[in-house]
């Protein structure tokens, strides 16, 4: 059973506080759009699909509360304006991920259409919004499973290495490297890149998953490793600067006998030409994959593809606080590594050093072998060009 990071019933929304993982499992209630803005900005919830869903549902909860308490205007245009203002506010929480802006635009159009219907009141406009936001939650889980199945099939057909063990069906097994966190903690459930790994594991086709630590926020060691252990998927954690050595090795010991066949990552925004903004460090992995002849795949729902952004040069890259690089937070442990004490923050850098901390980098489309979506895997044509418009 996979982790559940978002729990929702009408009028109630809770998120798993990812800042406390893997040491504490705490669900935070969100009652309003403002609550969600802070949760997203503070990265208590993260991952492009997840933040869009949490943002949308937080406003659904707020509208439900207002309607229940008879605090919504009876005028449809007033409610529409309220919703649009709050959606705009939510989009400002993290600017790079396109899913949030895409969801806000889509929900805004639904609200606008409902508000223009003759005889409709304010509560009915709010109801239209709530129903649309709830569908987003259902659709994301369905889409993630489709991404997982499509990606697993493509990997087994295109990225098999000759070395390694066989599954029970005689299919060669694969080892996959992933970066950051793209699983149940980053989506409504199952995951995108991690969903592909889950699908490979479910069919007995996965030899081993490798996950990077993903500095400076350690989403790999804190979150992806947590999910892999939770699901009993055979996995190994590496630091970010070990990836080249891993790809160069033909064998990593008796328990890890398959060379990496594919690197699969998620995305926060994919430009129309296939350039991909994702967690910092993704670009470097793509360069390594090209050198070592390893398939490099991006797994993302179509809502992550921004056809209005022509190339990666047009993507705004969020920069995070210096303290995320110079300090690290975790529980105190004994000298033998046993026991979990109070959470503490320690410094790991020289005082006074300058820090550059971009949250994302952009991987050129030329380094991407395929983009895994819920409707299949998009590959480049003979000229090396993605035609992403064909999947819409």
Swiss-Prot record:
Keywords from UniProt, A to Z, are: Amino-acid biosynthesis, Cytoplasm, Isomerase, Methionine biosynthesis, Nucleus
Q: Which domain of life is it from?
A: Eukaryota
Output the Gene3D superfamilies linked to this UniProt entry. Answer: translation initiation factor eif-2b, domain 1, Translation initiation factor eif-2b, domain 2
What top-level class of enzyme does the UniProt entry assign? isomerase
Subcellular localization is given as:
Cytoplasm; Nucleus
| GO BP annotation list | L-methionine salvage from methylthioadenosine
List the pathway annotation: Amino-acid biosynthesis; L-methionine biosynthesis via salvage pathway; L-methionine from S-methyl-5-thio-alpha-D-ribose 1-phosphate: step 1/6
Q: What is its main location?
A: cytoplasm
- EC number(s) on file: 5.3.1.23
- Signal peptide range in chain numbering: none
A GO CC annotation recorded here is: nucleus
What positions constitute the catalytic site? Answer: 268 (proton donor)
> At what residues does the UniProt record annotate the site feature described as Transition state stabilizer?
180
Question: GO MF annotations for this entry?
Answer: S-methyl-5-thioribose-1-phosphate isomerase activity
Query: What PANTHER family does this protein's entry cite?
Result: METHYLTHIORIBOSE-1-PHOSPHATE ISOMERASE
- What does the protein in this record do? Catalyzes the interconversion of methylthioribose-1-phosphate (MTR-1-P) into methylthioribulose-1-phosphate (MTRu-1-P).
Q: Which family does it belong to?
A: Belongs to the eIF-2B alpha/beta/delta subunits family. MtnA subfamily.
* Protein name from the UniProt record: Methylthioribose-1-phosphate isomerase
What is the organism field in this record? Ajellomyces capsulatus (strain G186AR / H82 / ATCC MYA-2454 / RMSCC 2432)
């Amino acid at each position: 059973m996979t982790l559940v990071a978002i729990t929702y019933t009408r009028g109630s929304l809770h998120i798993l506080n990812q800042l406390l993982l893997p040491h504490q499992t705490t669900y935070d209630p969100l009652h309003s759009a403002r609550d969600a803005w802070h949760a997203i900005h503070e990265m208590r919830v993260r991952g492009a699909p997840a933040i869009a869903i949490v943002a949308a549902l937080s406003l659904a909860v707020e509208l439900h509360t207002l309607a229940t308490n008879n605090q919504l205007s009876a005028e449809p245009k007033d409610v529409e304006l309220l919703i649009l203002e709050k959606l705009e506010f939510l989009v400002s929480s993290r600017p790079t991920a396109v899913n949030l802006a895409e969801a806000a635009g889509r929900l805004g159009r639904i609200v606008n259409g409902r508000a223009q219907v003759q005889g409709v009141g304010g509560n009915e406009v709010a109801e239209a919004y709530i129903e649309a936001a709830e569908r987003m939650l259902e659709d994301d889980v369905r889409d993630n499973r489709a991404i997982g199945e499509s990606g697993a099939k493509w990997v087994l057909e295109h990225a098999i290495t000759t070395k390694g063990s066989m599954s029970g069906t005689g299919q060669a097994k694969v080892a996959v490297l992933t970066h950051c966190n793209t699983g149940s903690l980053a989506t409504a459930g199952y995951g995108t890149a991690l969903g592909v790994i889950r699908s490979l594991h479910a069919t007995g086709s996965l030899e081993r998953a490798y996950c990077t630590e993903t500095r400076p926020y350690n989403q790999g060691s804190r979150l992806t490793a947590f999910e892999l252990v939770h699901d009993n998927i055979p996995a190994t954690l590496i630091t970010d600067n070990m990836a080249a050595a891993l790809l160069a090795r033909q064998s990593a010991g008796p328990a890890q006998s398959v060379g990496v066949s594919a690197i699969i990552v998620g995305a926060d925004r994919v430009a129309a030409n296939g350039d991909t903004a994702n967690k910092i460090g993704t670009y470097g992995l793509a360069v390594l994959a090209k050198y070592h002849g390893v398939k490099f795949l991006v797994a993302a729902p179509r809502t992550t593809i921004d056809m209005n952004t022509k190339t990666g040069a047009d993507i705004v890259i969020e920069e995070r606080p210096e303290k995320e690089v110079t300090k690290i937070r975790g529980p105190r442990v004994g000298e033998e590594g046993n026991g979990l004490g109070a959470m503490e923050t320690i410094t790991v850098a020289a005082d006074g050093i300058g820090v550059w901390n971009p949250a994302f980098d952009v991987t050129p489309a030329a380094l991407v072998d395929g983009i895994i979506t819920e409707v299949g895997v998009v590959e480049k044509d003979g000229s090396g060009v993605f035609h992403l418009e064909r999947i819409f």
